[in-house]
Amino acid sequence: MKKRNLLAGEATDTVLRSDMQIVIPDDATVLCRRSAGRLAQALTLDGLEPAIVTGQDATARQTVRMTLGNGGMTYRVTADGAGNCNLTAGCDRALQQAVLELCGKVKNGRLPQISAVEGNAESLLRVMYYNVYGYGNLDSVPDRLGQQAALIADAAPDVLCVQEFDRLHRAGAKPLLEKAGYSEVPVTEDGGFLYPAGKNCEAIFYRADRLELLRSGGEPYPDRVEVDGAEVIGNNSNTKSTAWAIFRERTGGKIFLAVNTHFMWSAPELTGKQANAVRVDNARRMVVLIDAIRALDPAYANLAVIFGGDLNCGADSDPCAVVKTVLTPVYDMADTERDNIGYYGVYATYDETTGQYRYGEIPCEGGGIDHVFAAGLTVRNYLADTCFRARITSDHLPKTVDLILN
């Protein structure tokens, strides 16, 4: 029986398809892993598919090796003629473009012999929403900062929207972010980063080399909210707030609005009905805020918007329905890669001994309370990061959105 070459267009006497591997970096991002899966699916035929392995586990004679470089949007694909292919890209978004191009060349589960392919991927902006705190022992937060900083560095978002960014994160994580080239968005009229109460748990950071900050602001949610004629708690020690920023691309000059928020949770002082009513109030305030920002300047009238955070409610909830009156869930907009993964379980199990969340299975689709919505832009990818670092450092998973401004 003839053995078939996975990459060559003709039958050869080399190796069985199942002996072929797609090799990804040991610290591959979620988009890199998804791209490898897309290529493996395209190369699958007759129930056989190439294995996806990390560099240290590569053993096959035929490989497609994926390498991420220095953050640029270029990519290059080369083949050695013996069934091996190398994909080198500046970042995971460029790698995705190379994989999509390769998938277009696959016929009958095989990739024909190719000459070198290179190009520039479309310039995607990446926005990450990430609740970094997680409940548990406060003293353990500094131990988790390095893992979270590495996770953020791997994803390399252009805009980072963090929730529950408390004093310990400000002391430990903010210097790491600044060292990596991020600047924080001011939220007060005098250019400060903290509200008068001394907190700003919903901070926005951005890459100043890629984006210019035009305007920004923010405010905590009210301490008390009226529900059915009675005032109930509307905040938790000033930890629930909103920050916003208008950015202009340094290349291209297009502008957009990024909004980061954290809606009220189901505090013990509230009934389920009351907590829902407070979150509906939060959502209505967001709709008013977006309209008010667009009214600041005629140039902002049709401003593209990305809005999200920890909304403490499901996708089909009343608060999300309010947001959907003006914005669309990015899950519905993503046209290339997407998932609907929330945090794992009702809450991750926190281990007081280690100060981390117990390593568990990769979360399933649905069940999330972190949501992202948008308008006036194109969404390529919407993915939750389910890597090991993400699963041990918070009870929420980072959500990344890759977008193009229209």
Feature-to-residue mapping (PLM):
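Metal-dependent phosphoester-hydrolase catalytic domains
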Residues: 291-306, 313-406
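Structured beta-strand-rich core segments of catalytic domains in phosphoester-bond hydrolases
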Residues: 164-263
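N-terminal, active-site-proximal structural segment of metallo-dependent hydrolase catalytic domains
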Residues: 117-179, 189, 193-200, 406
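His/acidic metal-ligating clusters that form di-metal
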Residues: 239-261, 272-308, 316, 321
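Active-site environment of divalent metal-dependent phosphoester hydrolases
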Residues: 134-136, 167-171, 265-269, 312-318, ...
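Acidic, contiguous N-terminal accessory segments
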Residues: 1-119
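Acidic/histidine-rich helix-loop elements
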Residues: 129-146, 193-194, 222-236, 264-278
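Active-site-proximal beta-strand elements of phosphoester/diester hydrolases
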Residues: 86, 124-137, 215-219, 255-265
